[in-house]
């Protein structure tokens, strides 16, 4: 059966936490100060093919909070998933890997970050929702511009 005639299938096989790290290097002294944090969040999405239509996608969230020049905490979560994508052309597959899969994984990563930060003794941290569609569109635009040069 050719790819054009194959029925499209998008399925989640597994969602799991691949890596978790939480550090509060300046505790307990940091807890005695007025908490005026400066938050920096880094987000990264990686994907790779495992075998015939099966892909592994990882959303990595790193949240670093500083007070003045001291790190209050550093939290990193890698939320991963295994997805089946069958019958899609290359553009559709790239879209699913860059938008739909991260949209599926991010709420789990967001919850894990919030839980780790709270368990670390800090006020709850609720990460803002991420517009993976916009990030993907920006990525495509930058790719198109770099090929023109």
Swiss-Prot record:
Of the GO CC terms on this record, one is: cytoplasm
Record keyword Hydrolase present: no
Q: A GO term (biological process) for this protein? A: protein tetramerization
Locate the coiled-coil region(s) and give their ranges. none
Question: Is Chaperone found in the keyword set?
Answer: yes
Annotated compartments: Cytoplasm
Q: Which Pfam families match?
A: SecB
Task: Give the keywords, sorted.
Answer: Chaperone, Cytoplasm, Protein transport, Translocation, Transport
Q: Which InterPro entries match?
A: SecB (IPR003708), SecB-like_sf (IPR035958)
Family of this protein = Belongs to the SecB family.
Q: What function does the entry list?
A: One of the proteins required for the normal export of preproteins out of the cell cytoplasm. It is a molecular chaperone that binds to a subset of precursor proteins, maintaining them in a translocation-competent state. It also specifically binds to its receptor SecA.
Oligomeric state and interaction partners are given as: Homotetramer, a dimer of dimers. One homotetramer interacts with 1 SecA dimer.
Tell me what this protein is called.
Answer: Protein-export protein SecB
- Report the source organism: Hydrogenovibrio crunogenus (strain DSM 25203 / XCL-2)
